[in-house]
Amino acid sequence: MLGEVIGGKVVKSSKPEIGILDIDFLENKKKDQLFSTFPDKIKSLQWHSYEVQDLENIKSVTLIASSPETKYQIFKFQEHAYGIQFHIEIKDTTVSDWGCVPEYKSALESQLGKGALAKFDNDAKINMSSMNKYSTILYDNFKKLV
C-alpha cells in the first residue's frame, strides 16, 4: 500500500516468493536507525505473489534491502515510513495457521509442490530463533525512535 501511495506500483510478481528465503541488506542500512544493527543477510518468511515496483525515480525513497526475486524488500520513504515486503511478525504457528487457509495452501502447493506445507513449516521452525531475534531488534530500534 505504501508503495502505491508514494508513486510506485504494486504488481503481480513474475513468480511467487514463498519460503524461508534470504534478504540482502544494502549499504544504506548502515545509516538507518531501524536496520543499522542487522547483519548483511538474514533469513525471512516470504509468502507473497505481488510486489512493489517503480520507486527508482522517487528521490525520497531509500532502498534498504532486496532479495533475488524482489527488489524492494525494505524501503524507507523520507524519514517516517517503511515498506517491508517479507513477514517479520512470525511465531511458531504462523505457517501452519496460514496453511489452514485453502487459498494460501493452494498457492503454496502450486509453487512448491504437494506436501510443501510441512517442509515450509519445518524450515520456519528451524530458522524461528534467528527470525524472532531480528523482529526483536527491529522493535527495540523502533521504540528508540518514538
Where do the language-model regions lie?
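Amide-donor transfer/coupling interface in amidating biosynthetic enzymes
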Residues: V11, F25-V146
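Cysteine-nucleophile active-site neighborhood
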Residues: M1-K29
